[in-house]
Amino acid sequence: TLSSSSAASDVYKRQVNPGAPVIFGSFASSMSMQTGAPTFGTPEPAKVLYGCAKLARRLGVPFRSGGSLTGSKTADAQAAYESTHTILPTIMGGTNFVLHSAGWMEGGLVADYAKLLLDADQLTMMPKLVNGIDLSENAQAMDALRETGPGQHFLGSAHTQANFEDAFWRSQMADNTTFEQWSSEGSVESSARVQTRG
């Protein structure tokens, strides 16, 4: 029904205003049969998204879909995994226009500042994820292989020193210290930590 209603809207739009641009959009979620509330981060809506994205490409129109969606009431583990499992299909499906990519909580009823910052941080990773594998001369690091002998490590090589700053995506919000350091600094959890970094 998503595709037929979108197609019907497109036909109607072409009759009313021929040549006007169109965007194919979808919003799919599963539902809790216990409460009737929408649920997010489940596989079924991701499959709907993938199918609609393919249909939009077949029709030659841009595709719009949702982003970092969650039913959680706070920026907690549930918010993190549901948002991850909704933004990844959105990005991997080739969505052209993303709604609700950051800060969306409780099924869209609430916007949350901490979640907005956490989601925005994760969104900076997406280009690195979808741009594929870098096979450039620099990325292959053949000079580092030649410079570093058997039994040695690459940390001190000229190539590592020249590339370590941007070789890997780094979160601006995550804490990558040891447990002891984290504990000595007050054991601050992510939703509180982002308040000081945002």
Enumerate the language-model features and the residues they cover:
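Short, hinge-like loop/turn segments at secondary-structure boundaries
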Residues: 40-42, 82, 116-117
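Charged helix-capping and loop-helix junction motifs
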Residues: 79-85
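Histidine/acidic-residue-rich catalytic or RNA/ligand-binding cores of hydrolases
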Residues: 75-78, 109-113
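Core alpha/beta catalytic barrel or barrel-like domain that forms the active/cofactor pocket
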Residues: 14-40, 52-73, 93-108
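Single conserved hydrophobic/aromatic residue that forms the stacking wall/gate
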Residues: 1-8, 12
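Catalytic-core signal marking the mid-to-C-terminal active-site face
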Residues: 114-198
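N-terminal, Lys/Arg-enriched amphipathic/low-complexity engagement segments
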Residues: 45-46
